Amino acid sequence: MRRPKKYEAGEATQYISRRAAIRKLQLSLNDFRRLCILKGVYPREPKHRRRAQKGSSEIKILYHTKDIRFLLHESIVWTLRDYKIFAKKTSRDRAIKDFRNLKRRLALFPEIKLDHIVKERYPTFIDALKDLDDCLTLLFLFSTFPSLHLIPREQSNLCRRLTIEFLHYVIASKSLRKVFISIKGYYFQAEIKGQKVTWIMPHYYPFKPQSRQEVDFKVMSIFVEFYTILQGFTNFRLFHGLNLAYPPQFPSSLLQDNEDTFKDEASFVSDRIAALNFELLRTDKVQEDEEEPDIDMELLEQDGDSKRIIKMKQEAQEVSRLRTLFKGLKFFINREVPREPLVILIRSFGGKVSWDASVFPGATFAENDETITHQIVDRPSLSTQYISRDYIQPQWLFDCVNQRQLLPTNDYFLGETLPPHLSPFVDSKRDSYIPPEEKALHDPSLIETHEQSEEESEEDEAEKEEEEADQELLDAQLQLAYQQETAEYKKYGGPDGVNEDEEDLSEEDDEEDDDEEDVDKEDVDEQTKRKQQEKEKMSVQSGKVHKVNKRQVHKAEVDEHRLQARMVKPRHRNLFRKLIREKQTKEKEEWLLRKKRRNIDADNKEAKKAAKREARKQAAEAAARAAKLVK
């Protein structure tokens, strides 16, 4: 038997460098990158890099050999090779100015078909929904881009169309569950076929060109090329699941014969679709106002009353209430407020919404409509206001959805300081720092309290001294009033302030009290004798207070931790150190957040005190002015 040579078996044969893979596939670097992105092949990190690189110690980009073999049988490879041939022939035709032949070749441009790759990477529809987060986030981002060198206008328009179609499905199915506003954009989470799909809709900012070193638009554009095909298949399946016509269409009642429709019906329909404010055409001709919940409540009632079943019942009831949260409410969006995120939010939960017709087409009612219940405003004041509606800031909608109930609007009025906007995507039972507002939201009894510092204790003592001084002043006033009253009583009564008849009655009462006191003394003597007899039988020893030495407890904890560190196996020591480091950083972050919160609370407390002092000062000045006027 021949002995195998070094690096002919094992880890050395499992990996291949990028240069060798390009040479094997006979592609350029850009084509190889494009092929890997479309097929979902990515670099791998070997366990022993030196063995995988056949003794070489330099850092190389490695791929699995089986992945490269998998790419060899892909039909796209031939299309990418055809691109090279096409480019050479078209450049030759341009050079010799053979425009007739050039026109014929441009008509035969080789196109890459990605349908089979989508089916290959996502065998089931649920697999496609699980991978929809990055797809939607990137499509929403590209839908806001202008026409660039590496991003054609057709691609941005396609991204815009696909995202609008998906939003129409979310509104029709009422599958939105969580929302959040951050500096990155608007976070949305929908529940589709039991899968949670989360995406980000960016804020509307002017486009700022980025350098190639920061953002590689070419690579991102390749991802978008694949994601548009995936999203198109997904939208088609989702629309047909709700019996909606695809591509989206409107009922004939909406397309009235007017000047706009006569000019250009296609642009009229596309504008109304982008408005997200109209119901779409259904194929079954039956429009259901409320979709049935995914959970069968009768089946849950037949099962036992286990904790899991009870939790599922409660969740199903909350979701059914959430789907009609804004039902019966009418909203009007001011022109300074972002329209699209709020329209998605309101219509997904059963509300009606409109805006100024000059901002975007598709407005259904004007601002002077008396049936409007809420107007969403993001400015300090308004010149004209209606009594019949509430003027609120946009955060009210997001907080209502996250808490699954209609919150009071007084904290969200114009000019009010908004309450903290809590994220619904964090775990309420996490080990890290939890703000007091979030604790109070889940359980009011768990509001955070912290130990008082020296400054806080001094402030509390000062407050107590002020209260004592006020109380002493009040007592002195009461004493003075009592003395005046007794003086008047002495003037009109007996010499000591008591009448003669009252003196006789008081003497009789004193005699009765003396008799009662003698009887009480006899009872007390008997009780003391009994207690002495009981004490003789029992023996009680004096106890000692056990004082806990915090320093010794801390030392014991440190010693125990060191013992645990010594008992860790050598191969697990790096992992143990990493875990300890992560724990320390978490504790430090939590401590910093608590300290920051204490400082904020102290500043707020000081501001309230200053406001109270100012109010007292103004009240005293007003009282002094009033006294002068009376004189």
Curated annotation (Swiss-Prot):
* Region (Disordered), start-end ranges: 428-471, 489-561, 602-631
Q: Does the keyword Phosphoprotein apply?
A: yes
What is this protein identified as? Answer: Pescadillo homolog
Report the family membership: Belongs to the pescadillo family.
Q: Which PANTHER family match?
A: PESCADILLO - RELATED, PESCADILLO HOMOLOG
Output compositional bias ranges, type Basic and acidic residues.
428-442, 526-538, 602-619
Question: What is one GO cellular-component annotation here?
Answer: PeBoW complex
List, alphabetically, the Gene3D superfamilies matched.
Answer: BRCT domain
Q: Which GO terms describe its molecular function?
A: ribonucleoprotein complex binding; RNA binding
Q: What is the lineage of its organism?
A: Eukaryota, Metazoa, Ecdysozoa, Arthropoda, Hexapoda
Q: Which GO terms describe its biological process?
A: maturation of 5.8S rRNA from tricistronic rRNA transcript (SSU-rRNA, 5.8S rRNA, LSU-rRNA); maturation of LSU-rRNA from tricistronic rRNA transcript (SSU-rRNA, 5.8S rRNA, LSU-rRNA)
Q: Where in the cell is it found?
A: Nucleus, Nucleolus; Nucleus, Nucleoplasm
- Pfam families xref list: BRCT_2, Pescadillo_N
